[in-house]
């Protein structure tokens, strides 16, 4: 921590440290503050102690943050509240098919090493369409490369029109999500939008932690490492279909 930096002359009411390396925690604690929260080395640097024995390792990430809030507020938040999604007019007339037959697929993720092969998702989509489902592909800006392929195979991409995204407002996607029966996805941002919109997901994991990034009650997971597979892209379609059949029993 150097005196000539952006924190000079500032003092924070509260700093919440999410570092896992002691040296970084020590540097962060040098920033002027009134109170400092840190789980590092069993709360040794923290002004707040874990006298309630809350769990902070190996848990769902949202529970992790609410446990932090519980200690700071000295009030345990047992139930994690749902989000009330405001109206979004742009989303109102895009999807008019029966929700019980609508299945969404989100083939993207922030990094390709977290993505199941797109062609495999396309194969799953074709199979589900033959069974009478309406398939909608949810593509973010980074998945624009799949847009034409989806359209050529007569699959709708409700977030897009004339080669451009209709809106980048998160409520737009979440309102569209509410019209879906479920979502098939990787561990990416779209999955979170669906889960917080109250839609169940079948989420495939490779390098990320399925326990940490799966919303309880809204997410069924596939961890490819459990099948002896190192890279998510190599997970076989037939094995995915078996998991999908089990997932459909829950939605």
Task: Give residue spans per PLM region.
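Catalytic machinery of carbohydrate-active enzymes
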Residues: 1-251
């Amino acid at each position: 921590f150097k005196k000539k930096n952006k924190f000079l002359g500032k003092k924070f009411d509260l700093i919440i440290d999410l570092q896992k390396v002691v040296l970084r925690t020590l540097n962060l604690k040098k920033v002027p503050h009134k109170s400092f929260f840190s789980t590092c080395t069993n709360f040794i640097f923290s002004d707040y102690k874990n006298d309630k024995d809350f769990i902070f390792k190996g848990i769902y990430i949202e529970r992790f943050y609410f446990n932090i809030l519980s200690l700071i507020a000295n009030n345990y938040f047992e139930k994690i509240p749902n989000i009330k999604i405001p109206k979004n007019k742009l989303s109102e007339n895009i999807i008019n098919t029966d929700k019980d037959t609508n299945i969404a697929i989100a083939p993207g993720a922030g990094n390709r090493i977290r993505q199941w092969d797109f062609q495999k998702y396309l194969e799953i989509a074709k199979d589900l369409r033959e069974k009478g489902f309406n398939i909608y592909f949810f593509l973010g800006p980074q998945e624009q490369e799949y847009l034409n392929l989806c359209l050529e195979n007569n699959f709708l991409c409700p977030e897009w029109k004339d080669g451009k995204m209709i809106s980048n407002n998160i409520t737009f996607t979440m309102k569209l999500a509410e019209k879906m029966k479920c979502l098939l996805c990787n561990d990416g941002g779209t999955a979170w939008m669906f889960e917080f919109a109250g839609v169940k997901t079948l989420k495939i994991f490779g390098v990320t932690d399925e326990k940490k990034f799966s919303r309880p009650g809204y997410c069924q997971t596939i961890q490819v490492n459990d099948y002896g597979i190192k890279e998510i892209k190599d997970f076989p379609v037939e094995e995915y279909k078996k998991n999908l059949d089990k997932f459909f029993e829950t939605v």
